[in-house]
UniProtKB/Swiss-Prot annotation:
It comes from Yersinia pestis. It holds the Pfam family LplA-B_cat. It is found in: Cytoplasm. Catalyzes the transfer of endogenously produced octanoic acid from octanoyl-acyl-carrier-protein onto the lipoyl domains of lipoate-dependent enzymes. Lipoyl-ACP can also act as a substrate although octanoyl-ACP is likely to be the physiological substrate. Belongs to the LipB family. Substrate binds at residues 75-82, 142-144, 155-157. This is Octanoyltransferase. The keyword DNA damage does not apply. The active site is at residue 173. NCBIfam families: lipB (TIGR00214), PRK14342.1 (NF010922). One of its GO terms (biological process) is protein modification process.
Length: 233
């Protein structure tokens, strides 16, 4: 666990089911305009069907997207899939203020997922050669971050109770033949709503925050500047 950040609060936003592009732009705007005193935030969201290509993404890993759009992202990593039943958690953390490095944050996120899955009696692990969290050889959680001005954004995508078929249309995270799994395949009946509070509790514990404070989320709050628009999300 990291040194306690009791002097810093963290805000939780529940976004529900949202398209990828406007949420990504809102996250960029938040990061661009935050100050040294802006509280860190966690955003919980399920995205409508989308493939996102990370900065290292290669076109050959998108095999047959079909009717699912492919959007370029500036997060780390390669291509992945988002859809309903998958919990995406975006983590906007001021690393300078927290006095932690990127590797420490990645480890904290991976440990957050490992401990969350343990709560549901699922054994999982991280891999030194491939970011994310795995159950045996199957991937259950993808991870991709970007750091701007010492602050993180993007985050994790945990498969919970979703249609995994679209993963067969890509090489997930750039690995041909990578098999995906999800919480409900290992513990039938577990839902996104079951996992959310455990995931938030474990993340705040890993980084030593006090309890996250739930506040409403509105897209209009993040439409801050006309020059913050970008084609890379």
């Amino acid at each position: 666990m990291m040194p306690r950040l009791q002097q810093h609060k963290i805000i939780l936003r529940q976004l529900g089911l949202q398209p990828y592009a406007p949420v990504s732009q809102a996250m960029h705007n938040f990061t661009e305009f935050r100050t040294d005193t802006t509280p860190d935030e966690i955003w919980l969201v399920e995205h409508q069907h989308v493939f996102t290509q990370g900065q290292a993404g290669k076109a050959e890993h998108v095999l047959m997207p079909g009717d699912i759009p492919v959007i370029q992202s500036d997060r780390g990593g390669q291509v992945t899939y988002h859809g309903p039943g998958q919990q995406v958690m975006y983590v906007m953390v001021d690393l300078k203020r927290a006095k932690i490095g990127v590797r420490q944050l990645v480890t904290a996120i991976e440990n957050t997922v490992i401990e969350t899955l343990a709560h549901f009696n699922i054994d999982s692990h991280a891999r030194p050669d491939a970011p994310g969290v795995y159950v045996e050889q199957q991937k259950i959680c993808s991870l991709g971050l970007r750091i701007r001005r010492g602050c993180s954004f993007h985050g994790l995508a945990l498969n919970i109770a979703m249609d995994l078929e679209p993963f067969q249309r890509i090489n997930p995270c750039g690995y041909a033949g990578m098999q995906m799994t999800q919480v409900s395949a290992l513990q039938p009946g577990v839902t996104v709503a079951d996992v959310q509070p455990v995931l938030v509790r474990e993340f705040t514990r890993q980084l030593g925050y006090p309890t996250a404070k739930l506040q409403p989320w509105s897209l209009s709050d993040y439409l801050l500047s006309s020059h913050s628009s970008s084609s890379v999300l």
